[in-house]
């Protein structure tokens, strides 16, 4: 049987959990195998900036951080299940990559 590997990426872990729950419900309804969601390492992007705009005075820095969370879900690539996966309502800041394996 074919397997679909779905990689979810986003900055809000609650929205990722929402999409994972939708995928779990699809797997239960269609009766296909489900593995995951597997949490992958969180990527931290740190941007240090100077607090003072003119460059004079004490060199104090602020650090801004963006965390990118990732989840990996494996689901059986049944035709019915894949049609429902394509119809899942995905929030704006969550991206999905689907890879089919034979």
From Swiss-Prot:
InterPro entries, A to Z: Ribosomal_uS10, Ribosomal_uS10_CS, Ribosomal_uS10_dom, Ribosomal_uS10_dom_sf, Ribosomal_uS10_euk/arc
According to the UniProt record, one GO cellular component term is:
small ribosomal subunit
- A Pfam family reported for this protein in Swiss-Prot or TrEMBL: Ribosomal_S10
Q: Which residues form a coiled coil?
A: none
Q: Which UniProt keywords apply?
A: Ribonucleoprotein, Ribosomal protein
Gene Ontology MF term list: structural constituent of ribosome; tRNA binding
Is Zinc there in the keyword field?
no
One GO term under biological process is: translation
- SMART domains registered for this protein in UniProt: Ribosomal_S10
Report if keyword Ribosomal protein is assigned.
yes
Read off the HAMAP family from this record.
Answer: Ribosomal_uS10 (MF_00508)
Q: Subunit notes for this chain?
A: Part of the 30S ribosomal subunit.
Reported function:
Involved in the binding of tRNA to the ribosomes.
Q: Which family does it belong to?
A: Belongs to the universal ribosomal protein uS10 family.
Descriptive protein name? Small ribosomal subunit protein uS10
Primary gene name: rps10
